[in-house]
Amino acid sequence: MDVRADQHQYNPYRVFSRDQWAKLRDDAPMTLDAQEISALRSMHDRLDLQEVEEIYLPLSRLLSIYVASMQQLYVAQRRFLGIVDRKMPYIIGVAGSVAVGKSTTARVLQALLARWSPRPKVDLITTDGFLYPNAVLERQGIMQKKGFPESYDLPKLLAFLSDIKAGRRRVRAPVYSHLTYDIVPNSHITVDRPDILIVEGVNVLQTGKLPRDGKAVPVVSDFFDFSVYIDAEEPVLREWYVSRFLALRDTAFHDPRSYFHRYAPLSDEEATATALAIWERTNLANLEDNILPTRPRATLILKKGADHVVETVALRRL
């Protein structure tokens, strides 16, 4: 295949145009209908049959190859070591900025992978559940940095992923409410030995500081077998964030339980100014300082244009 010359920011990747990538679908069957695709789409994200056929079906086909190869390697390693071990799930990370469409991508992948033969068990979690409760963030003076690396209970998240990777049964993860903008007390989801686990979050590819004494310092991505970064230019992300904020002002913010209920009465001009201020103060800073620098660590990068559709795909060379 004639693949375009790598762009400097994507080295060491093979970069495919949308048309080139779409041809890699080969004979992968379409297993979702229009109604199912609509249900997977997040607010203001664009997802239709064509996007699934041209972008996500080729990715599903690629992942089937990666998963099968990992399973063969796992069996070979067990045979080499002479051990009997628990089944290890394949873990996929999905990263990218606020408002870029991570949740849609993660849900589409979950739906497509779960329809492989012989119907693997595919679970999905977001790292939002591992944010510290608002009371803790307020006490530490970092409420304005919610979503930054320091706002997560990293030891709890690492322990969760370690248990999953070890094949343990009924591993629990905290639940986060986007309505109340906080951890739901005494509420958990249970992940019970999936074949594939998708982990979605803004900072899942974040690295830690290198130790001076040579001791291992684990990071979330140490547990990933494959990772996807959803990319878009900053002005586009800003526009998407503002559009989403305005849409939520007209819907979810009207619920008295909403953390952002105070924004419901705002005019379009006031809501736009508020959204831009939040973007500049929190989301842009997090993007520039923490999220975007992790892009080169991804296995695959999906670059979106202003219309929300993927324009290029960059796949890390083996």
From Swiss-Prot:
Q: Which residues bind ATP?
A: G96, S97, V98, A99, V100, G101, K102, S103
Stated EC number for the protein is: 2.7.1.33
* Annotated metabolic or biological route of this protein: Cofactor biosynthesis; coenzyme A biosynthesis; CoA from (R)-pantothenate: step 1/5
* Gene Ontology MF term list: ATP binding; pantothenate kinase activity
A single GO CC term, please?
Answer: cytoplasm
- SUPFAM superfamilies (UniProt xref): P-loop containing nucleoside triphosphate hydrolases
Where is the protein situated, by its record's location annotation? Cytoplasm
Q: Which domain of life is it from?
A: Bacteria
What organism is recorded for this protein?
Rhodopseudomonas palustris (strain BisA53)
Alphabetic keyword roster: ATP-binding, Coenzyme A biosynthesis, Cytoplasm, Kinase, Nucleotide-binding, Transferase
Q: Which cysteines are joined by disulfide bonds?
A: none
Q: What is this protein called?
A: Pantothenate kinase
Q: Could you tell me which InterPro entries the record lists for this protein?
A: P-loop_NTPase, PanK, PRK/URK
GO biological process terms, semicolon-separated: coenzyme A biosynthetic process
- Family note: Belongs to the prokaryotic pantothenate kinase family.
